[in-house]
């Protein structure tokens, strides 16, 4: 029996096509994935992300514990509400999950982890917390709605109270703030401005309906995937997992090497990998017909004339650009052109940074 979010009936009311997503009944689309995608790029769309897992880490050792648990360094967070993206690694530097951590106080942090990795993550966090003065509490009574797009903030403002709007006025990107019963964050998975709103389950349906009434378009997993891929954002399980280190997943920027005496889990293995050199994650663009897909092989010849092979981790048709884009893991000697094998023939592709669309515009 699949899990259902508190918004399940609201999805059915909007004629959602429901699919199983890692044990959750979730909307794939509400009729047109392309229309949903374009709504987020041009206006405002919303996603039920209540299947995500909210975990509060509280206690005298909260900071010290998270500095060991995560490859990024929560000690960088000095302003209440500031958020940090990064990886939680195992001892071999494989990525257990990627997650966002919010700094609330020196003894209180909020962590949001993926739904597909929930049980594994919670078990790992509990195991690693032994010996630290911390309490790790999952918050299943909280739902989450992401409102994204150039008009998302204005439309969300119409459903928030005057006090809530005052609390979040001028909030910079990658911050979160408790505003009444809501935790409102300027984060997202689309490359657009907007909010991710953590809302008590008993208020979630009313908030969803209020956003619908403001003309915010409900969007499913299909649009969520094309939007995040255009934005060059990783999907756990495709672009990285426990067999992949963050340097090979375009996550090098999330690793806090300094201070050098911070012994985060996986550090020694990661230093060895860094010094030896790893594969890297790049973007691919194919302007001729066809769609780049997960697991297609990528070939290129280096400056010495040696052929190398990599693989597409995520690929799709980009509605914003009008052609296919992909992310691929390849040896780091790649230049700015390559070939992808499709239907038993090789097709030329351009190699770009894995970031295709930002704020509705081409980003490469």
Swiss-Prot record:
GO terms for molecular function: aminomethyltransferase activity; transaminase activity. It catalyses: N(6)-[(R)-S(8)-aminomethyldihydrolipoyl]-L-lysyl-[protein] + (6S)-5,6,7,8-tetrahydrofolate = N(6)-[(R)-dihydrolipoyl]-L-lysyl-[protein] + (6R)-5,10-methylene-5,6,7,8-tetrahydrofolate + NH4(+). Belongs to the GcvT family. It comes from Shewanella baltica (strain OS155 / ATCC BAA-1091). The gene is gcvT. Keywords: Aminotransferase, Transferase. It holds the Pfam family GCV_T. The glycine cleavage system catalyzes the degradation of glycine. The glycine cleavage system is composed of four proteins: P, T, L and H. Disulfide bonds: none annotated. It is an enzyme of class 2 (transferase). Coiled coil: none annotated. GO terms for cellular component: cytosol; glycine cleavage complex. GO terms for biological process: glycine decarboxylation via glycine cleavage system. This is Aminomethyltransferase. InterPro entries: GCS_T, GCS_T_bac, GCST_C, GCV_T_N, GcvT/YgfZ/DmdA, GcvT/YgfZ_C, TrmE/GcvT_dom1. Its EC number is 2.1.2.10.
